[in-house]
Amino acid sequence: MKNRPVLVGIGSLQQKGSFSELDEALILMEKVTIEAIEDSQSLEIKNYIDEIQIPKGYWAYRDPGKWIAEKHGFSKAKTSVTKIGVLQQNLINSACKKILNGDIRAVSYTHLRA
């Protein structure tokens, strides 16, 4: 098996405090994405990200993955925002299958919850 999906970086963030002190959801998504890239211990991983998956939340952003990718230099990645209610495991399974098939090299998966 040439293409084997492996988890190479994790980002996690929890904010507490008054509403005025908390970051917008878009900034939180950016922070955890960058933290996961840094956690991989190879910033070059962003050059392999072919897809960015973000499950839809209760925010008004049209395509937060595109904004993150363009801001951080991996703008060729295909982005998707999935519908509310889609099982998160299905997204992970789909990404793994695409990697196994050689359709993509790496995926960034960002999920927020309140």
Where are these regions (language model features)?
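Extreme N-terminal starter segment of soluble prokaryotic enzymes
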Residues: 2-6
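Active-site pocket-shaping loop/turn-to-helix segments
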Residues: 12-34, 56, 78-93
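Phosphate/pyrophosphate-binding loops at sites that engage ATP/ADP/AMP, CoA/4′-phosphopantetheine
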Residues: 37-49
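Short glycine-rich phosphate-binding loop at a beta-alpha junction
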Residues: 49-55
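Conserved catalytic cysteine-centered active-site region
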Residues: 56-106
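Conserved small/polar residues in nucleotide/adenosyl-binding loops
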Residues: 110-114
